[in-house]
Protein backbone atom coordinates (compact mmCIF):
# COMPACT_ATOMS: atom_id res chain seq x y z
CA UNK A 1 0.00 0.00 0.00
CA UNK A 2 1.24 3.47 -0.87
CA UNK A 3 1.79 6.39 1.48
CA UNK A 4 0.37 9.89 1.71
CA UNK A 5 2.36 13.11 1.43
CA UNK A 6 2.27 13.63 5.20
CA UNK A 7 3.42 10.07 5.86
CA UNK A 8 6.37 10.50 3.47
CA UNK A 9 7.61 13.64 5.18
CA UNK A 10 7.15 12.01 8.58
CA UNK A 11 9.15 8.94 7.52
CA UNK A 12 11.96 11.09 6.14
CA UNK A 13 12.36 12.77 9.56
CA UNK A 14 11.95 9.75 11.81
CA UNK A 15 14.84 9.58 14.29
CA UNK A 16 13.38 6.74 16.33
CA UNK A 17 10.18 4.76 15.96
CA UNK A 18 8.19 4.50 19.16
CA UNK A 19 7.37 1.04 20.50
CA UNK A 20 4.48 -0.27 22.60
CA UNK A 21 2.42 2.86 21.97
CA UNK A 22 5.23 5.30 22.73
CA UNK A 23 5.56 8.37 20.51
CA UNK A 24 8.01 8.62 17.63
CA UNK A 25 11.01 10.93 17.79
CA UNK A 26 10.89 13.36 14.88
CA UNK A 27 13.67 15.62 13.60
CA UNK A 28 12.69 19.27 13.13
CA UNK A 29 14.26 21.19 10.24
CA UNK A 30 13.20 24.70 11.18
CA UNK A 31 11.68 26.45 14.16
CA UNK A 32 10.24 29.93 13.84
CA UNK A 33 9.84 32.10 16.93
CA UNK A 34 8.18 35.32 18.07
CA UNK A 35 7.91 37.38 21.23
CA UNK A 36 4.80 35.80 22.77
CA UNK A 37 5.60 32.09 23.14
CA UNK A 38 9.40 32.16 23.40
CA UNK A 39 10.33 33.83 26.75
CA UNK A 40 9.67 30.78 28.94
CA UNK A 41 11.52 28.52 26.48
CA UNK A 42 14.62 30.69 26.58
CA UNK A 43 14.41 30.84 30.37
CA UNK A 44 14.18 27.06 30.53
CA UNK A 45 17.39 26.74 28.52
CA UNK A 46 19.06 29.32 30.71
CA UNK A 47 18.10 27.57 33.96
CA UNK A 48 19.29 24.21 32.61
CA UNK A 49 22.56 25.66 31.39
CA UNK A 50 21.85 24.54 27.83
CA UNK A 51 22.52 26.09 24.44
CA UNK A 52 20.45 25.58 21.27
CA UNK A 53 21.36 22.34 19.50
CA UNK A 54 21.27 23.91 16.02
CA UNK A 55 20.98 27.67 16.42
CA UNK A 56 21.10 28.14 12.63
CA UNK A 57 17.74 26.36 12.41
CA UNK A 58 16.04 28.85 14.74
CA UNK A 59 14.78 32.17 13.37
CA UNK A 60 12.77 34.82 15.21
CA UNK A 61 10.76 37.91 14.36
CA UNK A 62 8.60 40.46 16.16
CA UNK A 63 4.98 40.48 15.06
CA UNK A 64 2.16 39.93 17.58
CA UNK A 65 2.66 42.87 19.94
CA UNK A 66 4.20 45.29 17.49
CA UNK A 67 2.52 48.60 16.67
CA UNK A 68 1.85 49.23 12.97
CA UNK A 69 2.25 53.01 13.22
CA UNK A 70 4.97 55.12 14.86
CA UNK A 71 7.24 52.09 15.04
CA UNK A 72 10.20 54.29 15.95
CA UNK A 73 8.50 55.45 19.15
CA UNK A 74 8.36 53.59 22.49
CA UNK A 75 5.64 50.94 22.65
CA UNK A 76 2.76 52.42 24.71
CA UNK A 77 1.86 49.03 26.21
CA UNK A 78 4.30 48.02 28.96
CA UNK A 79 3.65 44.28 28.67
CA UNK A 80 4.09 44.32 24.90
CA UNK A 81 7.24 46.40 25.19
CA UNK A 82 8.65 43.96 27.76
CA UNK A 83 7.98 40.96 25.54
CA UNK A 84 9.71 42.62 22.60
CA UNK A 85 12.79 43.69 24.55
CA UNK A 86 12.95 40.25 26.18
CA UNK A 87 12.99 38.57 22.76
CA UNK A 88 15.77 40.87 21.61
CA UNK A 89 17.87 40.12 24.71
CA UNK A 90 17.24 36.38 24.49
CA UNK A 91 18.14 36.19 20.81
CA UNK A 92 21.34 38.14 21.41
CA UNK A 93 22.32 35.93 24.36
CA UNK A 94 21.67 32.64 22.58
CA UNK A 95 22.77 33.70 19.11
CA UNK A 96 19.36 33.31 17.47
CA UNK A 97 18.79 35.24 14.25
CA UNK A 98 16.16 37.94 14.78
CA UNK A 99 14.25 40.19 12.40
CA UNK A 100 13.08 42.97 14.77
CA UNK A 101 10.65 45.80 14.20
CA UNK A 102 12.08 48.08 11.53
CA UNK A 103 14.16 45.34 9.91
CA UNK A 104 13.76 44.95 6.13
CA UNK A 105 12.66 41.33 6.58
CA UNK A 106 10.48 41.77 9.69
CA UNK A 107 6.93 40.57 9.44
CA UNK A 108 4.40 38.06 10.65
CA UNK A 109 6.26 34.84 11.35
CA UNK A 110 4.27 32.88 8.76
CA UNK A 111 4.76 35.51 6.06
CA UNK A 112 8.43 36.44 6.20
CA UNK A 113 9.75 32.86 6.15
CA UNK A 114 8.19 31.81 2.82
CA UNK A 115 9.22 35.09 1.19
CA UNK A 116 12.84 34.46 2.16
CA UNK A 117 12.71 30.89 0.88
CA UNK A 118 13.16 29.47 4.37
CA UNK A 119 10.01 27.38 3.94
CA UNK A 120 10.67 24.51 1.53
CA UNK A 121 8.92 21.28 0.47
CA UNK A 122 9.48 18.22 2.60
CA UNK A 123 10.61 20.13 5.68
CA UNK A 124 9.33 19.77 9.21
CA UNK A 125 8.58 23.22 10.59
CA UNK A 126 7.29 24.21 14.02
CA UNK A 127 6.51 27.41 15.87
CA UNK A 128 4.81 28.34 19.11
CA UNK A 129 1.86 29.55 17.07
CA UNK A 130 -1.32 27.86 15.83
CA UNK A 131 -1.04 29.07 12.26
CA UNK A 132 2.25 27.35 11.54
CA UNK A 133 0.12 25.18 9.24
CA UNK A 134 0.51 28.00 6.70
CA UNK A 135 3.85 26.54 5.59
CA UNK A 136 2.14 23.32 4.56
CA UNK A 137 1.25 25.09 1.32
CA UNK A 138 4.78 24.17 0.19
CA UNK A 139 4.45 20.49 1.04
CA UNK A 140 6.10 20.97 4.43
CA UNK A 141 4.78 19.25 7.55
CA UNK A 142 4.26 22.34 9.68
CA UNK A 143 2.36 22.68 12.93
CA UNK A 144 2.07 24.74 16.08
CA UNK A 145 3.58 23.63 19.39
CA UNK A 146 3.45 24.69 23.04
CA UNK A 147 6.10 26.66 24.89
CA UNK A 148 7.59 23.60 26.62
CA UNK A 149 7.94 21.99 23.20
CA UNK A 150 9.62 25.14 21.90
CA UNK A 151 12.25 24.67 24.61
CA UNK A 152 12.60 20.98 23.70
CA UNK A 153 13.23 21.78 20.03
CA UNK A 154 15.75 24.45 20.97
CA UNK A 155 17.64 21.95 23.11
CA UNK A 156 17.42 18.84 20.90
CA UNK A 157 16.07 19.82 17.44
CA UNK A 158 13.57 16.98 17.88
CA UNK A 159 10.04 16.37 19.13
CA UNK A 160 8.29 13.32 20.56
CA UNK A 161 5.03 12.85 18.69
CA UNK A 162 2.52 10.18 17.80
CA UNK A 163 1.76 10.01 14.07
CA UNK A 164 -1.19 12.10 12.96
CA UNK A 165 -4.18 10.69 11.12
CA UNK A 166 -4.55 11.73 7.47
CA UNK A 167 -7.46 13.42 5.74
CA UNK A 168 -7.92 14.26 2.08
CA UNK A 169 -10.04 17.29 1.22
CA UNK A 170 -10.70 17.16 -2.51
CA UNK A 171 -11.77 20.51 -3.93
CA UNK A 172 -13.01 19.35 -7.30
CA UNK A 173 -13.65 21.43 -10.41
CA UNK A 174 -12.81 25.00 -11.33
CA UNK A 175 -13.44 27.83 -8.89
CA UNK A 176 -15.94 30.45 -10.15
CA UNK A 177 -14.54 33.90 -10.89
CA UNK A 178 -16.14 35.44 -7.79
CA UNK A 179 -14.74 32.84 -5.36
CA UNK A 180 -11.31 32.98 -3.72
CA UNK A 181 -9.00 30.82 -1.64
CA UNK A 182 -10.52 32.31 1.52
CA UNK A 183 -13.94 31.18 0.37
CA UNK A 184 -12.61 27.66 -0.18
CA UNK A 185 -11.34 27.31 3.36
CA UNK A 186 -14.37 29.00 4.96
CA UNK A 187 -16.61 26.60 3.03
CA UNK A 188 -14.54 23.61 4.15
CA UNK A 189 -14.72 24.65 7.81
CA UNK A 190 -18.45 25.31 7.52
CA UNK A 191 -18.88 21.78 6.18
CA UNK A 192 -16.69 19.75 8.57
CA UNK A 193 -16.91 22.05 11.60
CA UNK A 194 -14.23 23.45 13.87
CA UNK A 195 -13.54 19.97 15.24
CA UNK A 196 -13.80 18.05 12.00
CA UNK A 197 -10.06 17.89 11.48
CA UNK A 198 -9.08 17.10 15.06
CA UNK A 199 -6.05 14.81 15.12
CA UNK A 200 -5.58 14.94 11.35
CA UNK A 201 -3.17 16.37 8.84
CA UNK A 202 -5.34 17.63 6.00
CA UNK A 203 -4.03 17.33 2.46
CA UNK A 204 -5.83 19.72 0.12
CA UNK A 205 -6.20 18.26 -3.36
CA UNK A 206 -8.09 18.73 -6.60
CA UNK A 207 -8.22 21.04 -9.60
CA UNK A 208 -9.26 24.13 -7.65
CA UNK A 209 -6.27 23.76 -5.31
CA UNK A 210 -3.81 23.18 -8.17
CA UNK A 211 -4.98 26.40 -9.84
CA UNK A 212 -4.18 28.53 -6.78
CA UNK A 213 -1.09 30.72 -6.48
CA UNK A 214 1.29 30.11 -3.58
CA UNK A 215 -0.16 33.09 -1.70
CA UNK A 216 -3.62 31.57 -2.12
CA UNK A 217 -2.45 28.12 -1.07
CA UNK A 218 -1.02 29.63 2.10
CA UNK A 219 -4.45 31.13 2.86
CA UNK A 220 -6.04 27.68 2.68
CA UNK A 221 -3.39 25.90 4.75
CA UNK A 222 -3.29 28.76 7.27
CA UNK A 223 -6.82 28.06 8.49
CA UNK A 224 -6.42 24.29 8.83
CA UNK A 225 -6.23 24.83 12.57
CA UNK A 226 -9.67 26.50 12.49
CA UNK A 227 -10.99 23.14 11.30
CA UNK A 228 -9.30 21.51 14.29
CA UNK A 229 -6.46 19.95 12.26
CA UNK A 230 -2.84 19.72 13.40
CA UNK A 231 -1.59 20.71 9.96
CA UNK A 232 -2.59 21.29 6.35
CA UNK A 233 -0.54 20.37 3.29
CA UNK A 234 -0.52 20.78 -0.47
CA UNK A 235 1.82 18.69 -2.60
CA UNK A 236 4.54 20.79 -4.27
CA UNK A 237 4.41 21.32 -8.03
CA UNK A 238 5.74 23.69 -10.69
CA UNK A 239 3.88 26.59 -9.03
CA UNK A 240 5.82 25.88 -5.83
CA UNK A 241 9.16 25.59 -7.58
CA UNK A 242 8.63 28.79 -9.55
CA UNK A 243 7.81 30.67 -6.34
CA UNK A 244 10.93 29.44 -4.54
CA UNK A 245 13.50 29.78 -7.32
CA UNK A 246 15.90 32.64 -6.69
CA UNK A 247 14.74 33.44 -3.17
CA UNK A 248 17.49 34.22 -0.62
CA UNK A 249 17.49 30.82 1.11
CA UNK A 250 16.51 28.64 -1.85
CA UNK A 251 19.14 26.22 -3.17
CA UNK A 252 21.12 27.28 -6.22
CA UNK A 253 22.75 25.58 -9.20
CA UNK A 254 23.23 21.84 -8.85
CA UNK A 255 21.74 21.92 -5.35
CA UNK A 256 18.56 23.42 -6.83
CA UNK A 257 18.29 20.59 -9.34
CA UNK A 258 18.79 18.03 -6.59
CA UNK A 259 16.19 19.72 -4.40
CA UNK A 260 13.57 19.84 -7.16
CA UNK A 261 14.19 16.18 -7.97
CA UNK A 262 13.43 15.31 -4.34
CA UNK A 263 10.50 17.70 -4.10
CA UNK A 264 8.85 16.03 -7.10
CA UNK A 265 8.66 12.78 -5.10
CA UNK A 266 6.57 14.50 -2.43
CA UNK A 267 3.11 13.47 -3.50
CA UNK A 268 0.57 10.98 -2.28
CA UNK A 269 0.80 7.60 -3.99
CA UNK A 270 -2.16 6.56 -6.13
CA UNK A 271 -2.81 3.55 -3.90
CA UNK A 272 -2.44 5.40 -0.61
CA UNK A 273 -5.40 5.28 1.76
CA UNK A 274 -6.47 8.30 3.82
CA UNK A 275 -8.16 7.87 7.18
CA UNK A 276 -10.88 10.27 6.06
CA UNK A 277 -11.95 11.84 2.76
CA UNK A 278 -14.05 14.99 2.24
CA UNK A 279 -15.24 16.22 -1.15
CA UNK A 280 -16.04 19.84 -2.01
CA UNK A 281 -17.58 20.93 -5.32
CA UNK A 282 -15.59 24.04 -6.21
CA UNK A 283 -17.94 24.95 -9.04
CA UNK A 284 -20.70 25.73 -6.53
CA UNK A 285 -18.64 28.02 -4.31
CA UNK A 286 -18.96 31.78 -4.07
CA UNK A 287 -18.08 34.47 -1.52
CA UNK A 288 -18.37 33.23 2.07
CA UNK A 289 -18.70 35.24 5.29
CA UNK A 290 -18.91 34.20 8.94
CA UNK A 291 -21.96 35.41 10.85
CA UNK A 292 -21.18 34.00 14.31
CA UNK A 293 -18.38 33.59 16.82
CA UNK A 294 -16.40 30.68 15.45
CA UNK A 295 -14.96 30.11 11.96
CA UNK A 296 -17.36 27.23 11.34
CA UNK A 297 -20.33 29.59 11.50
CA UNK A 298 -19.96 30.68 7.90
CA UNK A 299 -22.42 30.98 5.03
CA UNK A 300 -22.55 32.12 1.42
CA UNK A 301 -22.82 35.90 1.34
CA UNK A 302 -26.23 35.53 -0.33
CA UNK A 303 -27.63 33.68 2.71
CA UNK A 304 -29.30 34.95 5.88
CA UNK A 305 -28.43 34.71 9.57
CA UNK A 306 -29.68 31.31 10.79
CA UNK A 307 -32.90 30.98 12.76
CA UNK A 308 -32.00 28.95 15.87
CA UNK A 309 -35.53 27.62 16.17
CA UNK A 310 -34.99 25.67 12.95
CA UNK A 311 -31.80 23.98 14.21
CA UNK A 312 -32.63 20.48 15.45
CA UNK A 313 -29.42 19.80 17.38
CA UNK A 314 -29.77 21.33 20.86
CA UNK A 315 -26.07 22.11 21.27
CA UNK A 316 -25.82 23.80 17.87
CA UNK A 317 -29.07 25.67 18.53
CA UNK A 318 -27.76 27.05 21.83
CA UNK A 319 -24.46 28.02 20.19
CA UNK A 320 -26.32 29.85 17.43
CA UNK A 321 -28.49 31.71 19.94
CA UNK A 322 -25.45 32.83 21.93
CA UNK A 323 -23.57 33.88 18.80
CA UNK A 324 -26.49 35.87 17.39
CA UNK A 325 -26.92 37.70 20.69
CA UNK A 326 -23.22 38.46 21.02
CA UNK A 327 -22.97 39.63 17.42
CA UNK A 328 -26.00 41.90 17.77
CA UNK A 329 -27.84 40.28 14.86
CA UNK A 330 -31.39 39.16 14.22
CA UNK A 331 -32.34 35.65 13.09
CA UNK A 332 -33.24 35.57 9.41
CA UNK A 333 -31.68 38.92 8.49
CA UNK A 334 -29.81 38.84 5.16
CA UNK A 335 -26.03 38.79 5.52
CA UNK A 336 -25.86 41.69 3.07
CA UNK A 337 -27.96 43.87 5.39
CA UNK A 338 -25.27 43.84 8.08
CA UNK A 339 -23.61 47.25 8.40
CA UNK A 340 -19.93 47.34 9.31
CA UNK A 341 -17.87 49.89 11.26
CA UNK A 342 -14.29 48.84 10.50
CA UNK A 343 -12.56 46.96 7.70
CA UNK A 344 -9.31 45.08 8.33
CA UNK A 345 -7.24 43.74 5.45
CA UNK A 346 -4.14 41.89 6.59
CA UNK A 347 -2.92 39.03 8.85
CA UNK A 348 -1.00 35.84 8.12
CA UNK A 349 -4.13 34.62 6.34
CA UNK A 350 -4.62 37.44 3.84
CA UNK A 351 -1.87 40.04 4.14
CA UNK A 352 0.28 38.92 1.21
CA UNK A 353 0.87 40.70 -2.08
CA UNK A 354 -1.85 38.77 -3.96
CA UNK A 355 -4.34 39.77 -1.26
CA UNK A 356 -3.39 43.45 -1.42
CA UNK A 357 -3.61 43.42 -5.21
CA UNK A 358 -7.06 41.87 -4.96
CA UNK A 359 -8.29 44.54 -2.57
CA UNK A 360 -6.67 47.43 -4.46
CA UNK A 361 -8.21 46.36 -7.77
CA UNK A 362 -11.67 46.66 -6.21
CA UNK A 363 -11.01 49.87 -4.25
CA UNK A 364 -9.43 51.76 -7.14
CA UNK A 365 -11.52 54.77 -8.12
CA UNK A 366 -13.78 54.49 -5.07
CA UNK A 367 -13.94 56.03 -1.60
CA UNK A 368 -14.87 54.28 1.61
CA UNK A 369 -18.50 54.48 2.70
CA UNK A 370 -19.41 57.23 5.17
CA UNK A 371 -20.45 54.77 7.88
CA UNK A 372 -17.08 53.00 7.77
CA UNK A 373 -15.02 54.47 10.61
CA UNK A 374 -11.70 53.16 9.38
CA UNK A 375 -10.10 50.82 6.89
CA UNK A 376 -6.79 49.31 8.00
CA UNK A 377 -4.56 47.76 5.35
CA UNK A 378 -1.64 46.00 7.01
CA UNK A 379 0.91 44.06 4.93
CA UNK A 380 2.00 40.75 6.42
CA UNK A 381 5.69 41.55 6.07
CA UNK A 382 8.01 44.45 5.35
CA UNK A 383 8.90 42.92 1.98
CA UNK A 384 5.22 42.75 1.06
CA UNK A 385 4.89 46.40 2.05
CA UNK A 386 7.82 47.37 -0.15
CA UNK A 387 6.46 45.40 -3.11
CA UNK A 388 3.02 46.96 -2.70
CA UNK A 389 4.55 50.43 -2.68
CA UNK A 390 6.57 49.63 -5.81
CA UNK A 391 3.30 48.75 -7.53
CA UNK A 392 1.54 51.87 -6.25
CA UNK A 393 -0.99 49.93 -4.21
CA UNK A 394 -0.39 52.13 -1.18
CA UNK A 395 -1.57 55.15 -3.16
CA UNK A 396 -4.76 53.31 -4.13
CA UNK A 397 -5.45 52.53 -0.48
CA UNK A 398 -4.72 56.07 0.70
CA UNK A 399 -6.87 57.62 -2.05
CA UNK A 400 -9.65 55.28 -0.97
CA UNK A 401 -9.44 56.61 2.58
CA UNK A 402 -7.68 53.63 4.11
CA UNK A 403 -4.79 53.66 6.54
CA UNK A 404 -1.61 52.12 5.09
CA UNK A 405 0.29 50.53 7.95
CA UNK A 406 3.60 48.83 8.74
CA UNK A 407 3.84 45.04 8.89
CA UNK A 408 2.51 43.07 11.85
CA UNK A 409 -0.32 40.94 13.18
CA UNK A 410 -2.31 44.12 13.84
CA UNK A 411 -6.07 43.75 14.27
CA UNK A 412 -6.07 39.97 13.91
CA UNK A 413 -5.90 39.81 17.69
CA UNK A 414 -6.20 42.19 20.62
CA UNK A 415 -2.53 42.13 21.64
CA UNK A 416 -1.41 45.43 20.13
CA UNK A 417 -2.83 48.95 19.70
CA UNK A 418 -4.99 47.97 16.69
CA UNK A 419 -8.21 46.95 18.46
CA UNK A 420 -11.96 47.30 18.21
CA UNK A 421 -14.03 48.84 20.99
CA UNK A 422 -16.99 47.00 22.55
CA UNK A 423 -19.82 46.35 20.04
CA UNK A 424 -17.72 47.66 17.13
CA UNK A 425 -18.25 45.46 14.08
CA UNK A 426 -15.53 44.57 11.61
CA UNK A 427 -15.17 42.62 8.45
CA UNK A 428 -11.75 41.06 8.66
CA UNK A 429 -9.50 39.01 6.39
CA UNK A 430 -7.97 37.30 9.43
CA UNK A 431 -8.65 33.78 10.69
CA UNK A 432 -10.59 33.94 13.95
CA UNK A 433 -13.86 35.54 14.96
CA UNK A 434 -14.08 34.41 18.58
CA UNK A 435 -15.71 36.61 21.20
CA UNK A 436 -13.28 39.41 22.03
CA UNK A 437 -10.69 38.29 19.49
CA UNK A 438 -10.18 41.81 18.09
CA UNK A 439 -10.72 43.54 21.41
CA UNK A 440 -13.17 43.27 24.30
CA UNK A 441 -16.73 43.05 22.99
CA UNK A 442 -15.58 43.10 19.36
CA UNK A 443 -17.79 41.65 16.63
CA UNK A 444 -15.87 40.04 13.78
CA UNK A 445 -16.98 38.75 10.38
CA UNK A 446 -14.33 36.78 8.47
CA UNK A 447 -14.12 37.22 4.70
CA UNK A 448 -11.79 37.47 1.73
CA UNK A 449 -9.94 40.65 0.73
CA UNK A 450 -12.38 41.00 -2.18
CA UNK A 451 -15.42 40.96 0.10
CA UNK A 452 -13.69 43.22 2.63
CA UNK A 453 -12.92 45.77 -0.09
CA UNK A 454 -16.45 45.69 -1.50
CA UNK A 455 -17.86 46.06 2.01
CA UNK A 456 -15.67 49.10 2.60
CA UNK A 457 -17.20 50.70 -0.50
CA UNK A 458 -20.86 49.94 0.27
CA UNK A 459 -20.80 50.05 4.07
CA UNK A 460 -22.68 46.77 4.40
CA UNK A 461 -21.33 43.26 3.83
CA UNK A 462 -21.00 43.00 0.05
CA UNK A 463 -19.27 41.14 -2.74
CA UNK A 464 -17.63 42.77 -5.78
CA UNK A 465 -20.67 41.70 -7.80
CA UNK A 466 -22.76 44.14 -5.75
CA UNK A 467 -20.77 47.17 -6.87
From Swiss-Prot:
Domain of life the protein comes from: Bacteria
Record InterPro entries: 3-IsopropMal_deHydase_lsu (IPR004430), Acnase/IPM_dHydase_lsu_aba_1/3 (IPR015931), Acoase/IPM_deHydtase_lsu_aba (IPR001030), Aconitase_4Fe-4S_BS (IPR018136), Aconitase_4Fe-4S_dom (IPR036008), IPM_dehydratase_rel_enz (IPR050067), IPMI_cat (IPR033941)
Keywords in alphabetical order: 4Fe-4S, Amino-acid biosynthesis, Branched-chain amino acid biosynthesis, Iron, Iron-sulfur, Leucine biosynthesis, Lyase, Metal-binding
Pathway: Amino-acid biosynthesis; L-leucine biosynthesis; L-leucine from 3-methyl-2-oxobutanoate: step 2/4
One GO biological process term: L-leucine biosynthetic process
Cofactor(s) recorded in Swiss-Prot or TrEMBL: [4Fe-4S] cluster
Gene3D superfamilies, alphabetized: Aconitase, domain 3
E.C. code: 4.2.1.33
Reaction it catalyzes: (2R,3S)-3-isopropylmalate = (2S)-2-isopropylmalate
Cofactor: record remark: Binds 1 [4Fe-4S] cluster per subunit.
Keyword hit for Iron-sulfur: yes
UniProt region (Disordered), positions on chain: 423-448
Any Pfam family: Aconitase
Binding site for [4Fe-4S] cluster: 348, 409, 412
Molecular function, one GO term: metal ion binding
Entries under NCBIfam families matching the protein: leuC, PRK05478.1, PRK12466.1
Protein purpose: Catalyzes the isomerization between 2-isopropylmalate and 3-isopropylmalate, via the formation of 2-isopropylmaleate.
Similarity annotation: Belongs to the aconitase/IPM isomerase family. LeuC type 1 subfamily.
Subunit field text: Heterodimer of LeuC and LeuD.
Protein name: 3-isopropylmalate dehydratase large subunit
Source species of the chain: Bifidobacterium longum (strain NCC 2705)
Gene: leuC
Amino acid sequence: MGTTLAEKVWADHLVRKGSDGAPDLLYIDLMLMHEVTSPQAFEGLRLAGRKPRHVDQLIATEDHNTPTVDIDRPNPDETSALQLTTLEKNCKEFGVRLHPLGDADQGIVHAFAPILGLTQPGMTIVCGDSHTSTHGAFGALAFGIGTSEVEHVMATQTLSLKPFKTMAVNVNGKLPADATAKDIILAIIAKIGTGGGQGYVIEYRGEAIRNLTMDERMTVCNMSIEAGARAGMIAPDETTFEYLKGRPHAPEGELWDQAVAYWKTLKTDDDAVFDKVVDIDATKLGPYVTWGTNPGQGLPITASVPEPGKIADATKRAAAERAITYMGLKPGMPIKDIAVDTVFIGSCTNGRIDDLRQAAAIMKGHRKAENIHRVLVVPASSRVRLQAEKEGLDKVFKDFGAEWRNAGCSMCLGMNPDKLVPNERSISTSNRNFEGRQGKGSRTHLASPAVAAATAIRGTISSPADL
